[in-house]
């Protein structure tokens, strides 16, 4: 009995000391600077996601797209589809009424191409800064405004420090860009989270000299971006899509190298068509075949007993001409993968449960999605 009394007294003193500490912190730094996690709904709610425009990639990311309030990095070799993927994200955000900004440090954004991908260029905010410091100051101002939903910086490699621009061509500026990025990300991270802005940094690949074993590839701008990013996507061109002798697009592979929202190291492939962007029909067709929602017999494809055509291109054209099948397949795939509530189909209806459908499991080592048990995604 005596021990219980002593314990109660000790607990009471702890609670009083904690209340005093919390009160002191709130007086010094303002109300809300410290709180119990369960008392703040904004900290425990599900992370909002913006679709990438490729359903297979949305599933691979685990939450239905790229997370808002976080930093994401998209990198890869030249002409692999990095900017196209970002423009696709921008188009998806604008469809939901989002405000989007594009910091074009490379001064290479093709407005006509962006329009073809579905971007509303009339409402797109664009900046073409002269220096890396200017680009990151503009980024910080836009993020702190709280009015931006998606902000894309293209690219980290083009964020040239002012000292380098004002110096002579042969001057050495060791680690200047890395220090610039490190300082900027320290300032930006908290503001990005508070404003619930998705900030995407496009990055380029460089080769490390003298690497005998392991991967010699690295990204520009130092290591800070790797640490601060919640999602890192490695985009690669794996082949050409031809119509006879004409090349009409690229087969693109995206690997989720880092993911703080779901299990990483997933890999997907989809078609990037010239002048069109990500082929939604081709992506849906691949997922539907994997999940046995579309039957494939030899070169023939059929859905619900109806012939779609001979060959993948014919099946894609069938889906393009019959949007009702695309809506149906999209809803079934979302429901089967447990993210129907996060992604909305083209008619604005949330995915519903469908019996007899199998979830699509995106495998890390395979180039295409495989059928499997419902698991980590």
From Swiss-Prot:
What residue spans carry the region label Disordered? Answer: 346-377
Question: Where does the record place it?
Answer: Cytoplasm
Q: Which NCBIfam families match?
A: tigrfam_recA (TIGR02012)
Has UniProt tagged this entry with the keyword DNA repair? yes
> What is the recorded function of this protein according to its Swiss-Prot or TrEMBL entry?
Can catalyze the hydrolysis of ATP in the presence of single-stranded DNA, the ATP-dependent uptake of single-stranded DNA by duplex DNA, and the ATP-dependent hybridization of homologous single-stranded DNAs. It interacts with LexA causing its activation and leading to its autocatalytic cleavage.
Please tell me the species this chain comes from.
Bdellovibrio bacteriovorus (strain ATCC 15356 / DSM 50701 / NCIMB 9529 / HD100)
Task: Name the Gene Ontology biological process terms.
Answer: DNA recombination; DNA repair; SOS response
Q: Name one GO cellular component term.
A: cytosol
What are the UniProt keywords, alphabetically?
A: ATP-binding, Cytoplasm, DNA damage, DNA recombination, DNA repair, DNA-binding, Nucleotide-binding, SOS response
Name of the gene this protein is made from: recA
GO molecular function annotations of the record: ATP binding; ATP hydrolysis activity; ATP-dependent DNA damage sensor activity; damaged DNA binding; single-stranded DNA binding
Q: What is this protein called?
A: Protein RecA
């Amino acid at each position: 009995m005596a021990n219980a009394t002593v314990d109660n007294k000790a607990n009471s003193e702890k609670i009083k000391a904690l209340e005093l500490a919390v009160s002191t912190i709130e007086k010094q730094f303002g109300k809300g600077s410290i709180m119990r996690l369960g008392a703040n709904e904004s900290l425990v709610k599900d992370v909002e996601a913006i679709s990438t425009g490729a359903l297979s990639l949305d599933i691979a990311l685990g939450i239905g797209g790229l997370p808002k309030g976080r930093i994401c990095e998209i990198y890869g070799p030249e002409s692999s589809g990095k900017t196209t993927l970002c423009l696709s994200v921008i188009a998806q955000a604008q469809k939901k009424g989002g405000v989007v900004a594009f910091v074009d440090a490379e001064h290479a954004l093709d407005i006509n191409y962006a329009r073809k991908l579905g971007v509303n260029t009339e409402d797109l905010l664009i900046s073409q800064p002269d220096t890396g410091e200017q680009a990151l100051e503009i980024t910080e101002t836009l993020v702190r405004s709280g009015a931006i939903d998606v902000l894309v910086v293209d690219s980290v490699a083009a964020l040239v420090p002012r000292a380098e621009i004002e110096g002579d061509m042969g001057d050495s500026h060791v680690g200047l860009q890395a220090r610039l990025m490190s300082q900027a990300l320290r300032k930006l991270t908290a503001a990005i989270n508070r404003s619930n802005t998705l900030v995407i940094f496009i990055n380029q690949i460089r080769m490390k000299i003298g690497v005998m074993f392991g991967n010699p590839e690295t990204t520009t701008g130092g290591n800070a971006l790797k640490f601060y990013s919640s999602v890192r996507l490695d985009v690669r061109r794996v082949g050409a899509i031809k119509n006879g002798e004409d090349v009409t697009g690229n087969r693109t592979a995206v690997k989720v190298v880092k993911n703080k929202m779901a299990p990483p190291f997933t890999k997907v492939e989809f078609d990037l068509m010239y002048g069109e962007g990500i082929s939604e029909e081709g992506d849906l067709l691949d997922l539907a075949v994997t999940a046995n929602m579309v039957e494939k017999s030899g070169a023939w494809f059929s859905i619900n007993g109806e012939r779609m055509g001979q060959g993948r291109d014919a099946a894609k054209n069938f889906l393009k001409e019959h949007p009702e099948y695309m809506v149906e397949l999209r809803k079934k795939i979302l429901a089967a993968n447990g993210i129907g509530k996060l992604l909305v189909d083209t008619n604005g209806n949330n995915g519903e449960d469908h019996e007899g459908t199998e979830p699509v499991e995106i495998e890390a080592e395979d180039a295409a999605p495989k059928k499997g048990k419902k698991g980590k995604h």
